[in-house]
Regions:
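C-terminal transmembrane module of polytopic alpha-helical membrane proteins
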Residues: 1-12, 109, 165-243
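N-terminal TM1-TM2 helical hairpin plus the immediately adjacent luminal interfacial "cap"
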Residues: 7-124, 175-183
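Juxtamembrane/interfacial segments flanking transmembrane helices
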Residues: 35-37, 142-152, 197-207
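Membrane-embedded alpha-helical segments of multi-pass membrane proteins
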Residues: 71, 126-135, 182-189
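Hydrophobic, membrane-inserted alpha-helices
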Residues: 75-79, 161-171
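Membrane-helix interface "capping/anchor" motifs
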Residues: 86-91, 141-158
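Small-residue-rich segments of transmembrane alpha-helices in multi-pass membrane proteins
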Residues: 101-104, 157-167
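Membrane-interface micro-motifs in multi-pass membrane enzymes
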Residues: 114, 118-143, 154-157
Length: 243
């Protein structure tokens, strides 16, 4: 029996993201043919923020320059993102996207402001980080499901995610300090950490409860059992042997 690939319905939120993403890609190509580089205005750069282009903090995920990247990102949003949005609520899905997309952007911007001129116009853009975060979430929830690496090689979701993390790590280490792969790895780490924390909260935990638990454990470690030596000494009247 041949296995059939499950295609989830495209969710409303992901449909809007894909429409905006593709529209800006097409607009960027049209403007580039007329000598205008749209990504230089909408991609995130510390130089752009210093120049007053604050909107870059919002627009940077929706800009991309390569057709194949746009295609794969749209497919992941459809196949992976839609299933996760349907499993979660739309509100939780939006929060997750915000964490894995915009927090790395803020970190990238802070790096640019700290490093200075050499990073002023190094851009950060695209949905790669977001989609890697979605794949981490998918691997955590559906770890035993089979996915097709490069649409050819079947492997379990958890191993597929590990492979992608390894590829990003290799690209980060073989590139320069400004490589966007570092931000993609951060997106993956944030996805894992956020879901672990939200799972802990769903079970009734909180940061305050965790701190209180750690404090109790530390207090237990400081407690020492003190024996009363006088009580341990046998009385002369006590029998020395029991039969």
């Amino acid at each position: 029996m041949q296995s059939q690939m499950y295609v989830p319905p495209l969710s409303k939120l992901n449909k809007y993201i894909i429409i905006l993403y593709v529209a800006l890609f097409i607009l960027g190509k049209i403007l580039l043919s007329n000598g205008i580089n749209l990504s230089s205005y909408l991609a995130l750069t510390s130089g752009g923020i210093k120049s007053g282009l604050i909107f870059q903090l919002i627009t940077f995920p929706f800009i991309d320059t390569q057709f194949i990247t746009v295609l794969f990102n749209c497919l992941i949003l459809w196949f992976i993102g839609s299933e996760l949005e349907n499993k979660w609520s739309a509100l939780f899905y939006v929060k997750f996207l915000g964490v894995v997309t915009y927090l790395p952007g803020v970190v990238f911007l802070l790096m640019g402001l700290i490093i200075g001129k050499s990073m002023n116009f190094v851009p950060y853009f695209g949905l790669n980080g977001l989609n890697l975060g979605l794949l981490v979430a998918y691997a955590m929830i559906f770890s035993e499901r089979t996915m097709l690496f490069m649409f050819i090689f079947p492997m379990k979701a958890k191993y597929f995610c590990m492979l992608l993390a390894g590829v990003e790590m290799y690209m980060a280490l073989s590139g320069n300090a400004y490589s966007s792969s570092w931000m993609h790895l951060l997106s993956m780490g944030l996805a894992y950490g956020y879901l672990c924390y939200m799972s802990y909260v769903a079970r009734g935990g909180s940061l305050m409860a965790y701190k209180a638990k750690m404090d109790r454990e530390k207090m237990k470690g400081k407690l020492t059992l003190i024996k009363n030596e006088e009580e341990e000494k046998p009385k002369s009247s006590d029998p020395k042997y029991w039969q």
